[in-house]
Amino acid sequence: MLKTTFANAEFANPFMNASGVHCMTTEDLEELKASQAGAYITKSSTLEKREGNPLPRYVDLELGSINSMGLPNLGFDYYLDYVLKNQKEKAQEAPIFFSIAGMSAAENIAMLKKIQESNFSGITELNLSCPNVPGKPQLAYDFEATEKLLKEVFTFFTKPLGVKLPPYFDLVHFDIMAEILNQFPLTYVNSVNSIGNGLFIDSEAESVVIKPKDGFGGIGGAYIKPTALANVRAFYTRLKPEIKIIGTGGIETGQDAFEHLLCGATMLQIGTALHKEGPAIFDRIIKELEEIMDKKGYQSIADFHGKLKSL
């Protein structure tokens, strides 16, 4: 019922973790692999290992989360070794997603060259939208720099590649970014990363709740679902059909998943809710989505995918 075709591969269902959640270590990744998730993705890596920002840097909130992790990861080679080993052992399984988030265009190019030269046959996600590294702007808000980077990438990169985007809030920005993305043989876009630089306050303590950046951090969870749905829909209606969409943001229930698929997402990433609930969330959310589809008489996701009605 939930079978999903994406990047010329078949997945049992469209659900996966969002990079950054439950994917730091090989143990985390093995737990995801053993879960009911249709696919999983590694932690966004930099060439060298990073400790990330000082603690506390992640807090669960009533309707979501705030974080300023600062891209902590165990380094590019750690994750490349894992995916290559996994690929060798489990050739028949659905491909793994490998996330990178260089601190500069040059670092992204260096990592992509290593992936291109390796035997990795999965799907690469280039994160252009981390909002939590002090002093480092989100590249995908700079349209010229994004276009320049992608032009360079596609002079040598021939494997499946997606980009993870920040949320946009202006229709003109959707138009501009879609026009740029449509020039390239991208496999997908992932919309959205957390909404950058929100602020949550503990009114009892009269204080912020995370330490980095004076308490400013990326907001995730139910708070951002309307923004995520808008971004999925805006890109679904603007991108060429070869570029698929991964919907991320506020997916906690089967209902949320249904809405993302209705807007045009093909795969779905879960972040905040996975952090709160652990990998067992996939069992629950699959069941809930199947129940909604049964109730509506849908046999497959294709029956309603992207078919959001306008008034």
Swiss-Prot record:
Q: Known EC number(s)?
A: 1.3.98.1
Required co-factor(s) are: FMN
Its principal location? cytoplasm
Provide the protein's localization. Answer: Cytoplasm
Q: Which GO terms describe its cellular component?
A: cytoplasm
Q: The organism sits in which domain of life?
A: Bacteria
Amino acids binding FMN: S19, K43, S44, N127, K164, V192, G221, G249, G250, G271, T272
Binding-site residues for substrate, renumbered to this chain: K43, N67, S68, M69, G70, L71, N127, N193, S194
> Quick one: a GO biological-process term for this protein?
'de novo' UMP biosynthetic process
Q: Which reaction does it catalyse?
A: (S)-dihydroorotate + fumarate = orotate + succinate
Pathway note: Pyrimidine metabolism; UMP biosynthesis via de novo pathway
Q: How does it assemble?
A: Homodimer.
What is the recorded function of this protein according to its Swiss-Prot or TrEMBL entry?
Catalyzes the conversion of dihydroorotate to orotate with fumarate as the electron acceptor.
Query: Which NCBIfam families does the entry mention?
Result: PRK02506.1
List the protein's name: Dihydroorotate dehydrogenase A (fumarate)
